[in-house]
Amino acid sequence: MTITNDIRYAGVNDHQVDLFEGQYTVPNGMAYNSYVILDEKIAVMDTVDQHFQHEWLDNLAVILGGRKPDYLVVQHMEPDHSANIASFLNAYPEAAVVANAKTFAMIDQFFGPGLCENKVVVKDGESLSLGKHTLTFVFAPMVHWPEVMVTYDSTDKVLFSADGFGKFGALDVEEEWDCEARRYYIGIVGKYGAQVQALLKKAAALDIAIICPLHGPALKDNLAHYINLYDIWSSYRAESEGVMIAYTSVYGHTKAAAELLNDKLNELGCKKVVLCDLARCDMAEAVEDAFRYGKLVLATTTYNADIFPFMRTFIEHLTERNYQNRTVGFIENGAWAPMAAKVMRAMLEKSKDITYLPTTVTIKSALKSASVAQVEQMAKELM
């Protein structure tokens, strides 16, 4: 695959992985991206997952056409990108590894000391000339590991963005970018919005024509769309108008309340309502929707003087990713001492700029006229 006249794609598609990072379902697989810059000196940008050593080295050999690379640039040390550093150096022992000091420390941790005999330690803002192409290294700590840096090629105006602007899905599957990029961002990078904002500010000073991430397609058209979404996500603003109703239910009574609220909102003309059974939906997609929409209703039962486990897990996913700037409402159920709303609100106590609905729906075992009226009032408050 040709990115520009001098930049080639050397990555691989993985359709064997079932859970990315041990937790995210990837029905359309994953791409582990690597790039080669062909110039007077040749730079290889990152490696790939350990299971694709031979395929990746074969890809490199075809692109190199008998030449040998001068540099391996390591932007990110997560093993799906760094696992083949040793195999690369075994194949091309004269190549120098280009990375920052934190990256070299991690290389020692993963591979043991002494792997990189020929190395170029770069600092933030430093450049490396390949001949026609000049690479500038921009540090991006905690996007989403501390050693991360991105690389800007000023000749072809390409930003090699590490995990930034990545998405789930292999490159041989055609699918819309936004949803799987959103799920990827919220799940993996979402905690570090401030750090992403800092990187976006640095990137704004660059003349970028192409973004080459470590997962997902190279982005060439309408870059403003992708950058705008990253700005929204990393500033914790709602992307779309709508209400998400996330519920857990033991015997169906809390589910009935959630479905009633869904119906009432639709009757009132709510632009978008997403109803999610947390025991059965994909948790990462549920978290994605909570961040996508501006309003969230949490409905669950009191369980062991706490809340139902799937709801607790869901809220923990939200808070560890700095959930904020949203409107939240509660529906609680309890046969003798309903306290779920109190527990859920306490879990969100440290979340910034949360507006709570005036009405909390309290169900004692099953919906009755009083709790139905509360649901109807909550629907009005959400409009």
Language model features: what each stretch is:
Residues T2-L60, V150-D153, K157-S161, T254:
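Conserved beta-strand hairpin/beta-sheet module of binuclear metal-dependent hydrolase folds
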Residues H144, V148, G164-K191, S234-E239:
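Active-site-proximal loop/helix segment associated with metal-binding centers of metalloenzymes
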Residues C212-E239, T313:
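Short N-terminal or domain-adjacent regulatory/targeting segments
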Residues M45-T47, P69-M77, V97-N100, L159-D163, ...:
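Active-site neighborhood of phospho(di)ester-bond hydrolases with catalytic His/Asp-centered motifs
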